[in-house]
Swiss-Prot record:
Compartment(s) of residence: Melanosome membrane
Native source organism of the sequence: Bos taurus
Mode of membrane association: Single-pass type I membrane protein
Top-level class of the enzyme under EC nomenclature: oxidoreductase
Keyword Oxidoreductase: yes
Protein's name in the database: 5,6-dihydroxyindole-2-carboxylic acid oxidase
Function: Plays a role in melanin biosynthesis. Catalyzes the oxidation of 5,6-dihydroxyindole-2-carboxylic acid (DHICA) into indole-5,6-quinone-2-carboxylic acid. May regulate or influence the type of melanin synthesized. Also to a lower extent, capable of hydroxylating tyrosine and producing melanin.
Positions annotated to bind Zn(2+) A: H192, H215, H224
Glycosylation sites recorded in the entry for this protein: N96, N104, N181, N304, N350, N385
Length: 537
């Protein structure tokens, strides 16, 4: 690293006093010296009389520039380094004023619509359908693959990424912001990396790894929901097709094969190297980003747009761990959906009877926590056995998109069944980044976890076409049902016998000589007729 001049150091010091530790990904208009100095990211929408004349579309009533509201409630004890990470209080360590959009308007400059709305005035309801990839027509499958490849090669039209930490963000001369362009798909990868990266504590110190703003906590589902929604919106704009939707991969097959790993879809296994994708697939040409973990952790650098090696994938190939050689079963999903509490203390990867922890895959599908278990989402990732099984790299494998759309479908079904019951989503004391009102890192404009805790068809503009498996009974439940049935049968027989005994007793009383002898003969004849029926019963 080059040493800046004394003047540059002074300049940087003044800026850092204001911003503390910051920098991630922001709108291109905000990656400027002026915006960084002022701490204001409120781009113009349609400036008619010079820069700053239409911040956030103010002239047309679309939005206004306001102070950022960041969650300040306490987080859990898992993160002991308060003040050392630029993601704390997101995004206030970078900008303290952003666009607040009115009504159904949205976007970094209020120039787009909220999810679920469209039209020039954002007053038209929009609903797209996410379907099973295997149910698409041949043309639809081809179009999806082509769209992914296009996103990999198309520069993101709005966002740039930081390539240096706050101390170096202005460059060696103190006057050159260190941001880079990045493709739409690699931006999708980068945001995931940034949410899971370790906290850099300084040169010569080991980076802190027990921090994750998008996994192992209540925000797992809400964070990944917005992550997918952002990619879907970016691809819709890229294709100029608001009806485009991300399909899903129903990984709950219980099989030891990957049914979407074919060359016409996500790529089959290479015949030349079992850890690579077949050269007949377009995805064999993809190169990964954010793989230089050692540099990030020891030098404090950030992932940049440089691409490295190929995607690695070997489904069911981890012979050292038989548990991850087979995908989850359909009944695992059915059982998971019966876990009624969204989350439970300590709101972490060891929570039990937590729907979130169950679908994330740290608990048994019934909700029971077991440190040896990897199920559902986690198991599907580990089954891929390669790039897709490494948290910081996993989105580089495009199967990530399909795996998480299905996980989101399970989440949305749970929200529907339980009326989006947020009572067990903690307001505070969740792992850092996971409180209900926390702005999810590093999305822009700021969006809270609670904003994604809603049913998608009614609030986010998409729905799923999916058939959910019915739950089968476990062996213990079958035994219980059999015992109850047997006891019920005994009870019925006993009740029937009691009734017959009482009936016979009543008949005997009726035979007593309450009348004259001539009527007794009638009774005897009556007995001869009806006694045979009693033996049948």
């Amino acid at each position: 690293m080059k040493s800046p001049t004394l003047l540059s150091l002074g300049y940087m010091f003044l800026v850092l006093l204001f911003f503390q530790q910051a920098w991630a990904q922001f709108p291109r208009e905000c990656a400027t010296i002026e915006a960084l100095r002022n701490g204001v990211c409120c781009p113009d929408l349609s400036p008619l009389s010079g820069p700053g004349s239409d911040r956030c579309g103010l002239s047309s009533g679309r939005g206004r520039c306001e102070v950022v509201i960041a969650d300040s409630r306490p987080h859990s004890h898992h993160y002991p380094h308060d003040g050392r990470d630029d993601r704390e209080g997101w995004p206030t360590r970078s900008f303290n004023r952003t666009c607040h959009c009115n009504g159904n308007f949205s976007g970094h400059n209020c120039g787009t619509c909220r999810p679920g709305w469209g039209g020039a005035a954002c007053d038209q309801r929009v609903l797209t359908v996410r379907r099973n990839l295997l149910d698409l027509s041949t043309e639809e499958k081809n179009r999806f693959v082509r769209a992914l490849d296009m996103a990999k090669r198309t520069t993101h039209p709005q966002f740039v990424i930081a390539t240096r930490r706050s101390e170096e963000i202005l460059g060696p001369d103190g006057n050159t912001p260190q941001f880079e362009n990045i493709s739409i798909y690699n931006y999708f990868v980068w945001t995931h990396y940034y949410s899971v990266k370790k906290t850099f504590l300084g040169a010569g110190q080991e980076s802190f790894g027990e921090v994750d703003f998008s996994h192992e906590g209540p925000a797992f589902l809400t964070w990944h929901r917005y992550h997918l929604l952002q990619l879907e919106r970016d691809m819709q704009e890229m294709l100029q097709d608001p009806s485009f939707s991300l399909p899903y991969w129903n990984f709950a097959t219980g099989k030891n094969t990957c049914d979407i790993c074919t060359d016409d879809l996500m790529g089959s296994r290479s015949n030349f190297d079992s850890t690579l994708i077949s050269p007949n697939s377009v995805f064999s040409q993809w190169r990964v980003v954010c793989e230089s973990l050692e540099d990030y952790d020891t030098l404090g650098t950030l992932c940049n747009s440089t691409e490295g090696g190929p995607i690695k994938r070997n489904p069911a190939g981890n012979v050292a761990r038989p548990m991850v050689q087979r995908l989850p079963k359909p009944q695992d999903v059915a059982q998971c959906l019966e876990v009624g509490s969204y989350d439970t203390p300590p709101f972490y990867s060891n929570s039990t009877n937590s729907f979130r922890n169950t679908v994330e895959g740290y608990s048994h599908p019934t909700g029971r926590y077991d440190p040896a278990v990897r199920s559902l989402h986690n198991l599907a990732h580990l089954f891929l056995n390669g790039t897709g099984g490494q948290t910081h790299l996993s989105p580089n494998d495009p199967i990530f998109v399909l795996l998480h759309t299905f996980t989101d479908a399970v989440f949305d079904e749970w929200l529907r069944r339980y009326n989006a019951d947020i009572s067990t989503y903690p307001l505070e004391n969740a792992p850092i980044g996971h409180n209900r009102q926390y702005n999810m890192v590093p999305f822009w404009p700021p969006v809270t976890n609670i904003e994604m805790f809603v049913t998608a068809p009614d609030n986010l503009g998409y729905t799923y076409e999916v058939q959910w498996p019915s739950r089968s009974f476990s062996i213990s439940e079958i035994v219980t049902i059999a015992v109850v049935a047997a006891l019920s049968l005994v009870a019925v027989i006993f009740a029937g016998a009691s009734c017959l005994i009482r009936a016979r007793s009543n008949m005997d009383e009726a035979n007593q000589p309450l009348l004259t002898d001539q009527y007794q003969h009638y009774i005897e004849e009556y007995e001869k007729i009806h006694n045979p029926n009693q033996s049948v019963v």
